[in-house]
């Protein structure tokens, strides 16, 4: 009895730790940053000259260096649907008869053996045979569909410039309304050529995009099941 209680407690704590880890990963999305940004560099005006070697006179005001900012226009929409159907049928029959047995007739030259109480006596011919049939049917159907959409705007910081010139960006936004916190996190890689003249870029052009939109507060708590229900769902075998 003690072993059973100990095993149940171990399963309970493992399931609880798993749930807490999943919640912690979502809430701490983007914290700390995956990439470590370089410290900002102060620009010092050149003495005796109006020319700055940090930027070109005809350079666009677009993000291209570490700690530069770029605005991401998030407009993600996904839709998937899959249908599967399987039908299988199998029908077989078997009929075997024995005519000779080691060169002898199956009646062993004994005729007129009557069948009395399940045994052959005089009056019937011994003629063994095997006959059987089998039928198997299977049918299965499945249908699944999923749709998701997220829109918004977030300004990200360039945290790294890759050797090929692509920019690694990362951003995190928190909005609190009536003790309800909404967290929007975005990470990814963009090309400088995809940035518009207004220093904006569509989320469709973000490679390896990781977009998290989670909420914390009373509404979020009401939308999630209690810890005991989640634990029972994990161990319930039926």
UniProtKB/Swiss-Prot annotation:
Localisation per UniProt entry: Cell outer membrane; Bacterial flagellum basal body
GO biological process, one term: bacterial-type flagellum-dependent cell motility
Keyword terms: Bacterial flagellum, Cell outer membrane, Lipoprotein, Membrane, Palmitate, Signal
Membrane topology value: Lipid-anchor
GO CC term, one of those recorded: bacterial-type flagellum basal body, distal rod, L ring
Transmembrane segments: none
Domain of life: Bacteria
InterPro entries on file: Flag_Lring (IPR000527)
Major location category of this protein: membrane
A matching Pfam family: FlgH
MF term (GO), any: cytoskeletal motor activity
Subunit architecture: The basal body constitutes a major portion of the flagellar organelle and consists of four rings (L,P,S, and M) mounted on a central rod.
Entry function: Assembles around the rod to form the L-ring and probably protects the motor/basal body from shearing forces during rotation.
Family: Belongs to the FlgH family.
Protein's recorded name: Flagellar L-ring protein
Organism: Thermodesulfovibrio yellowstonii (strain ATCC 51303 / DSM 11347 / YP87)
Lineage, broadest ranks: Bacteria, Pseudomonadati, Nitrospirota, Thermodesulfovibrionia, Thermodesulfovibrionales
Gene that this sequence comes from: flgH
